[in-house]
Structures are given as structure tokens and as C-alpha cells.
Amino acid sequence: MKLKVVWLGKTKSAAIKALTEEYLDRLSHYGDIEGAELASEAALLKMAESSKTPPTLVLLDQRGRQLTSEELAEMLEAHQLRGTQSLIFAVGPADGFTQPARHLANLVLSLGKMTLAHELARVVLLEQLYRSFTIIKGHPYHRGE
């Protein structure tokens, strides 16, 4: 399974860039995982619609479904087991995704009830994806219940 984490807009903070690179490096040990900066929502929709095999698209939005770390790990493992070829997690712009993008998504996911800066949400997502893979592999990083 190819896992892609994309975010819309330029990254302004050097600290966010460093954390993004750190977690993408950690995630690279668990499979074909990459990050990408896209200019716009239109670029995301074009990428999703032009793929030979339609990807599973997960949009991050404060109005989305909330999962525990364990539930996210279960979701990722289920995609691996059923042979999902391409899974895209997209962190939107500060104002969120439009209705057409939300309609195209397979899942709209929220990181919680609090509002996060979209650059920070990217880092939280990457950490949660890393945590999920450590849960799947039985690595001691996760110390949940």
C-alpha cells in the first residue's frame, strides 16, 4: 500500500518543516510513505481523480469523525489486509475543505474537538500515523490502554 500525506499551501515554519521531515523519516521504515505539498485543493482533486486506481482519500477537517489511536491503527491495518493500493491523507487549508472535496472523500477525519493550526495538524497526523504503525507492529512506542 502506498501511503501519501499531502498538505495544501506553503509551509512557513522551519520547526514544522523539521518535524514533518522527522516523522516522514520515521514512517519510511513502515512502507512506501511520502509527503507532498500541494498548491491548492484543485491540485488534490486532480491528483485523486487522475489516478489509474482511485485512491482511498481521507480528508482532515474539524467536522470529521474522531478516532482513537488504536482505531486509526485498525483502519490502516484493514486497508493493508484488503490490498488498498493507494491511501491519501490530506490536511486542508486554514478554512477547511470545500463541499465537493468532502463529497469525494472516503472518510473525513477530525483530530479532535479543538481547533488546530493546519500546519500543526499535519504534524499531529504524522505522529498519529507513526503511532498507528508502531501499534500494528507491536513496537513499545505506544503506551495506551
Name each model feature, range by range.
Residues 23, 75-79, 104:
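Catalytic-core regions built around general acid/base machinery
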Residues 28-88:
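S-adenosyl-L-methionine/SAH cofactor-binding core of RNA-modifying enzymes
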Residues 86-100:
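Short glycine-rich, acidic/polar surface loops and turns
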Residues 99-144:
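Structured adenosyl-cofactor binding patch, chiefly the S-adenosyl-L-methionine
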Residues 17-20, 69-73, 102, 122:
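Conserved strand-to-helix beginnings and helix N-cap segments that scaffold or border functional pockets
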Residues 1-23, 27:
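N-terminal beta1-alpha1 ligand-phosphate binding loop
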Residues 5, 58, 92, 125:
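Conserved RecA-like P-loop NTPase ATPase core
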